[in-house]
């Protein structure tokens, strides 16, 4: 499709393709502006898990992600785009000491979306009870890769 917009149908097809290819069990998404797509993906059999972007949802996984990075427990295969986004990311702390990731300036063209997606994935991983899954998780043997 050409033009200035990416088709929702194309995005949905790519999500479903990647979910099948990588055996995605759950898909975390920011519910803001995604209700229709989430419903359609649910109808296609993908388990959609709302994951808000505020400090309440992002605090624990952000702190764990930072710890895992510092302890060299995360591998991203040298992905230059994720590395660039990590350099753009800033931690914002609220009055309660809870943190989330943001850009230095909300109008900045420097992106952090990949970092936020990584933190959301780690947040879902934190919620996922391995013992409830009949299959052994690959993460138990090789660790988490983003």
Predicted regions span which residues?
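Metal-dependent DNA phosphodiester-chemistry modules and their immediately adjacent helices/loops
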Residues: 16, 40-133
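Short glycine-rich phosphate-binding loop at a beta-alpha junction
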Residues: 21-33, 38
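Acidic, low-complexity intrinsically disordered tails
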Residues: 131-146
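Compositionally biased, intrinsically disordered low-complexity regions
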Residues: 4-5, 30, 99, 145
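Nucleic-acid-processing active sites and adjacent nucleic-acid-binding tracks
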Residues: 1-26
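Helical mechanochemical/support elements of P-loop NTPase systems and associated helical scaffolds
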Residues: 7, 11, 33, 57-61
